[in-house]
């Protein structure tokens, strides 16, 4: 059974570009009686609210395809993959997630062979995400860390006694797993970050487990791995992670970098027809500013400031577009084009 623990579910995009829900419509009917009074909680009581899924807070979704860089996952211990030779899990899981997201048609993504160390500080992870997004021209960066993939009792599979070997054979022939104790864990941590600000949009821990009864080294994503109970549990977990990521990404505004030269009326937008842009589209203009942090010593924060001007796309190519400011002004500094 797969499970997920959310530590930071709400998107941390700047408040001035986040969608603000309008007032709830007033019902046409008037209640005939007042609702019963609600008891006030005691002063020392703490009320725990359940986490709200991203789809519940998203009132409108951009039809444009966001861009995502997926890094290889890091592994907490190199020895966890020895059983079964599952050393390709670090690259295999991000690849499965990329395929899952692209099937949902919410992103265009690329996959890297490098990862972001989770033991790094928050400032370091922010800077790494910004650098990867800038280098690979993407809006988001996904990183992960494999925390556990050990067997509860490896001896039951790899060094069984006479009776344990007979029990293993019975379970393998009958495919009855309710009393099979050859359980293997998978726990991992996912972190989705905005590539322009480096802020975390989704931080969540996932866990699943299954029976691992494979001999030798079948390798990750092989036919034998597909047939295993452990493999099926992982594929189910990938589907859950893909749904969570797709919901979070769908609620974010579409943002693309702008290449503007001083005194040049035409600018280049770092997105094009592959993301769904069309000639004649208009986009909001935001300035990208780096300011000293008010809460962290010797640190900086990235802010997006909305400008009273709009961009109109003139020519759209597969990977980029050209545009001009509607009011004919010139740009000087770092700017972003945004469509919600």
Model segments located where?
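A generic structural motif
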Residues: 74, 150, 196, 210, ...
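A structural "domain/chain start" motif
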Residues: 2-106, 110, 219-224, 251-267, ...
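A structural micro-motif recognizing beta-strand termini
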Residues: 263-279, 324-329
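Short secondary-structure boundary motifs at beta->alpha junctions and helix caps
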Residues: 170-187, 193-235, 292-312
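Short, structured interface segments
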Residues: 226-252
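Surface-exposed short loop/turn segments
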Residues: 123-196, 294, 301-302, 315, ...
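N-terminal segment of the mature soluble domain
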Residues: 63-154, 199-203, 278-281, 286-302, ...
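Beta-strand/loop-dominated core regions that host nucleotide or nucleotide-derived cofactor-binding catalytic loops
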Residues: 285-340
